Amino acid sequence: MLTHWNNLLNTDCIVVDVGPHTIYPIFKNGSSSLMSVADKTYVNKQITECNNIDIIIRDPETRFVAGLNEYCQQNNLDIEDTWELVYEGKLINRHFAPQWLWLLHLYKFYKGTVVLKSFKSLTKYCSVRKNKSVKKIDVALINNFVEIDYKLMDHINETTDLETLIRKYKNVLS
């Protein structure tokens, strides 16, 4: 299942410091806002310097719908036609890629402690909301885009080892 995600997994991985917090920005989870207020940026191997990374996790349904809408808006595409391509496995994009995929991406460079935070906690790190979508067209969920993300919601505010989290759900990915 992970093979078709390789193009996304092979992009630069970025972690930022915002004040005293180190955060892994995920697309459609406040990443533009976090990047705009970042004091320091770590890329790929520099991420090993980090300790205790916060990761904002958004409600999977809300994020999938917002991400697909954002992608269609940016590319001037019809949402229903685009949804079909995603459903058929012919289209992937970081805006609606599962959040667990983003954790795998981080895991390439970081094996330490993480704290999953709710999307509501974004205001703790920044007051700016960049790229907030206004108009959203509802679409049906695609199970393999949200299944593990719903399980991640059970770990909000838990401090855990990223490796432990990855191992816990790796069988679901197979």
Where in the sequence are the language-model features?
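PAPS-dependent sulfotransferase catalytic domain
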Residues: 6-14, 44-57, 61-164, 168, ...
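Extended, structured, electrostatic nucleic-acid-contact surfaces
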Residues: 13-25
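Hydrophobic residues on the short alpha-helix immediately C-terminal to a glycine-rich phosphate/catalytic loop
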Residues: 37-38, 156
